[in-house]
């Protein structure tokens, strides 16, 4: 279905409910530059570090795209997707069933869920929705939950310390969204809905947060404008 969530005035706080879940795949493909390409890049990198029965957990797994694609490319993995949206989990389960892949999707708060024993943990555009006071605690939990040779993949929207550059990058992103078919009204509505809900960090703040949690090797494997993907090794 086509994303039309923000083509009408906002009447409630943004949440990942049934209305959003029903169009979320289209929303991601049109709102996140190079979304499919980035996910495929992460999978192609990650599969080289994985062995049979390794546990991989996707935090904020939404409709399950990442784990389903990983399952199609590499078999015999213990794949778990966690999301606190029941509507997202329902769609993820239906998609996994349709593709005939084995992935466990759990409706839970990953801040409370036991992540221990994971070879890899993935969070694509998820951490940015965690309140800053809880964010460092989550990253430390991820580090502690990984095996000694574990990997954390994190994609985030970014801000820059230079205010003029930040405005330029935001304008470039809004131009991209217009090219993808969103109206200025829809863009403005979504910006208002996500204000104080999605709280991005700078590149350096994200790297420092990963270092403070204990990660020693951190690389940026993808970047477009104000979007980036980090890989961190325990």
Swiss-Prot record:
Catalytic reaction equation(s): prephenate + S-adenosyl-L-methionine = carboxy-S-adenosyl-L-methionine + 3-phenylpyruvate + H2O
Name of the featured protein: Carboxy-S-adenosyl-L-methionine synthase
Gene name for this UniProt entry: cmoA
Ligand binding (S-adenosyl-L-methionine): 35, 60-62, 83-84, 124, 191
Assembly notes: Homodimer.
GO MF term list: carboxyl- or carbamoyltransferase activity; S-adenosyl-L-methionine binding
A Pfam family reported for this protein in Swiss-Prot or TrEMBL: Methyltransf_25
Protein's GO biological process: tRNA wobble uridine modification
Keywords: S-adenosyl-L-methionine, Transferase
Function: Catalyzes the conversion of S-adenosyl-L-methionine (SAM) to carboxy-S-adenosyl-L-methionine (Cx-SAM).
Superkingdom: Bacteria
E.C. designation(s): 2.1.3.-
Organism: Nautilia profundicola (strain ATCC BAA-1463 / DSM 18972 / AmH)
Protein family according to the UniProt entry: Belongs to the class I-like SAM-binding methyltransferase superfamily. Cx-SAM synthase family.
